[in-house]
């Protein structure tokens, strides 16, 4: 057995006692939360620890000292009510009484299933509740009839405690909650007729805590602020799925930052990961641009799978995100960014941040020139991988700061050819491979390389919106050179000179005094 297992302790004649916290509907005492608690490993120690905790719970329960623990664990007790059913809730907590939308997925009857057993299963079928019909799409409820659901927001000066879990949920408890709703609003939101209905309550306690509970009501007539002649009342446990609640587990930023509009150019290996992770990070207004379609040869280094082959990458990513990540607005454009800018389908000034994830130096140089020539003050993040994972690079460039993207390039004194000064791969080598002739070349690197670049990007995006960056930056992550050597390619002098795994250069350090775009430090 589990040597760390606590001993279960039950209360005899539990139904004869007053209703008290930390005892479930079968009389078992809830002794400890296992998370963060050190439990004695020997049996006598476990017994003593458990008995002392049981004594404390009962003593505080009889005296009423721990009554407010009901408030801290309201939903836990609600879940133990008889016939409690799961409901998934994705609505805005905007403090308004209103009608929201919902649906119940129909459960098919099994071939040899008795009707009474089928009815029991149907009563446990999950319910899905959203702000509107559009918000229900995340649960694939296309063929499910949509219901109007009453949503009431309650503020109480006194604590509202969960009902006694040893008894069925009563009509009196329901009506006590309905009495908090103004009669006029109640009549307009909840139908008076004797039809099945669902009611959701957002309960605000005096302590500032908020609880979400619901009820499935069969029959009943509304009279003033009470329901009468209810045939059946079933408690609903609300599993919250709204963005505000879900983001509590992951958010590290001010929620206002997530409203920033971000333009991402390129939906390939790096861009695809960046777009998905920006959505997961909570950013809710993304515009993504890419004129290419997803092909089979990209599958093993792209976030999307075979399901999306031969679709435009930007549109496929939108479909994928809308299926999996709630409350993200994505605008797609299957067009070359140069054409989109010239035709004004895209206006850089409309965004708070631009991310270029194409890995195409020539395109990035074009974007950089357009930004600086037009004195656009929207910051730009450029991302690119190097061949065989020898390096990952992220650059932050903002007009008005020293240095620009063009500063990363110089000309060979002997040949006059342009080369990339940031590269960890020695210049003059052929680093591309062919996938079938002219126009089908690519730079070889794996999915892990793109993930590393994506992580550098996300950290930079966070720093930008938290206003932590004062200078233009180039961040370079040095990779292993094993694969490079296996393919008979040589490393650059920069790779040899760099001792650190990550090298950060400011604009003043990487600026090219002969740059014809930023003119050193934008004239400063």
Positions of PLM-derived features:
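Conserved acidic residues
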Residues: 334-337
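Glycine-rich phosphate/adenylate-binding loop
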Residues: 69, 73-222, 349-353, 357-524
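Glycine-rich adenosine-cofactor-binding loop
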Residues: 253-293
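Short amphipathic alpha-helix with an adjacent loop that forms part of the alpha/beta core around
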Residues: 340-349
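Glycine-centered motif in EGF-like
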Residues: 14-70
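Glycine-rich phosphate-binding loop and adjoining beta1-alpha1-beta2 segment
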Residues: 291-327
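N-terminal charged helix/coil linker that caps or initiates catalytic domains
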Residues: 209-262
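Short, small-residue-biased leader/transition segments that mark boundaries at the very start
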Residues: 3-4
């Amino acid at each position: 057995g589990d040597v760390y297992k606590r001993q279960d302790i039950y209360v005899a004649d539990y139904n004869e006692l007053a209703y008290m916290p930390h005892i479930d509907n079968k009389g078992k005492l809830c002794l400890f939360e296992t998370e963060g608690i050190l439990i004695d490993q020997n049996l006598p120690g476990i017994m003593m620890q458990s008995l002392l905790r049981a004594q404390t719970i009962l003593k505080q329960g009889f005296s009423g000292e721990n009554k407010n623990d009901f408030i801290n664990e309201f939903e836990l007790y609600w879940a133990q009510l008889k016939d409690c059913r799961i409901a998934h809730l994705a609505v805005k907590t905007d403090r308004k009484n209103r009608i929201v939308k919902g649906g119940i997925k129909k459960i098919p009857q099994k071939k040899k299933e008795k009707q009474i057993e089928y009815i029991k299963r149907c009563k446990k079928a999950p319910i899905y509740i959203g702000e509107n019909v559009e918000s229900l799409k995340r649960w694939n409820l296309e063929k499910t009839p949509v219901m109007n659901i009453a949503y009431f927001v309650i503020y109480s000066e006194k604590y509202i405690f969960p009902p006694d879990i040893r008894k069925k949920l009563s009509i009196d408890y329901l009506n006590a909650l309905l009495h908090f709703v103004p009669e006029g609003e109640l009549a307009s939101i909840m139908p008076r007729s004797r039809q099945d209905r669902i009611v959701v309550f957002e309960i605000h306690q005096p302590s500032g805590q908020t609880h979400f509970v619901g009820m499935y009501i069969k029959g009943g007539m509304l009279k003033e602020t009470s329901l009468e002649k209810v045939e059946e009342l079933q408690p609903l446990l609300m599993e919250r799925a709204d963005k505000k609640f879900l983001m509590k587990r992951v958010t590290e930023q001010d929620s206002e930052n997530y409203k920033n509009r971000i333009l991402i150019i390129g939906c390939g290996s790096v861009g695809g990961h960046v777009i998905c992770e920006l959505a997961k990070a909570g950013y809710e207004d993304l515009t993504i641009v890419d004129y290419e379609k997803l092909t089979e040869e990209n599958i093993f280094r792209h976030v999307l799978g075979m399901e999306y082959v031969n679709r435009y990458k930007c549109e496929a990513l939108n479909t994928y995100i809308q299926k999996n990540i709630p409350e993200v607005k994505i605008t797609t454009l299957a067009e070359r960014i140069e054409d989109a800018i010239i035709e004004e389908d895209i206006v850089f000034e409309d965004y708070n941040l631009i991310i270029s994830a194409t890995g195409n130096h020539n395109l990035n140089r074009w974007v950089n020139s357009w930004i600086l020539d037009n004195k656009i003050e929207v910051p730009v993040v450029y991302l690119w991988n190097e061949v065989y994972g020898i390096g990952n690079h992220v650059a932050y460039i903002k007009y008005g700061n020293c240095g620009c993207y063009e500063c990363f390039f110089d000309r060979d004194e002997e040949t006059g050819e342009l080369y990339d000064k940031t590269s960890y791969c020695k210049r003059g080598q052929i680093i591309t491979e062919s996938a079938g002739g002219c126009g089908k070349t690519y730079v070889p690197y794996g999915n892990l390389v793109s993930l590393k670049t994506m992580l550098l990007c996300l950290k930079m995006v966070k720093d930008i919106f938290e206003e932590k960056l004062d200078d233009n930056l180039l961040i370079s992550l040095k990779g292993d050179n094993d694969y490079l050597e296996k393919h008979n390619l040589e490393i650059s002098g920069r790779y040899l000179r760099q001792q650190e795994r990550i090298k950060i250069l400011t604009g003043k350090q990487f600026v090219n005094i002969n740059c014809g775009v930023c003119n050193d430090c934008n004239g400063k």
